[in-house]
């Protein structure tokens, strides 16, 4: 069975897409990032939650501060990438639910009045949105390098509001020389899918 999406687009988004470890110097513009967001904001979440927050690290001073919080192996590529984004979850996302989920505005108080519940929902749904963001970067013809090797608390204190939880840092740009490690294997269908 074939998929509806054109095979070239499937390759761009998944089969040929790789996590880049080196990048060219070509800038990533605000217009490109906005086009990516304007596409991926339509990805589904529970209750149409939109807890993902994206902090673009552009200035040399901010980049230096971020690199200090990255794991040693992630520092050179984070310093060299044309653009770096900190993806975080806004734990006060529920304040926007009356606007984003208008057919049930009471969802804000009915389901998310307790902080632990809110934090769990924010992390789960922002992680979904982060995955859409990575695919959106690929759809723009760019490479993404998502990383979780970092001092999360240090990044939160340095860059984020108190109510935001950092999820990952993503390097973004055109892949440079020797950008890829060898492709790692993936689990086969039968290892993942069961029928009951």
Curated annotation (Swiss-Prot):
CDD domains: RutE-like. InterPro entries: Nitroreductase (IPR029479), Nitroreductase-like (IPR000415), Nitroreductase_HadB/RutE (IPR050461), RutE-like (IPR023936). Keywords: Flavoprotein, FMN, NAD, NADP, Oxidoreductase. GO terms for molecular function: oxidoreductase activity. It comes from the Bacteria. Coiled coil: none annotated. Pfam families: Nitroreductase. It is an enzyme of class 1 (oxidoreductase). Its cofactor is FMN. Its EC number is 1.-.-.-. Belongs to the nitroreductase family. HadB/RutE subfamily. This is Putative NADH dehydrogenase/NAD(P)H nitroreductase SCO5049. It comes from Streptomyces coelicolor (strain ATCC BAA-471 / A3(2) / M145). The lineage of its organism: Bacteria, Bacillati, Actinomycetota, Actinomycetes, Kitasatosporales.
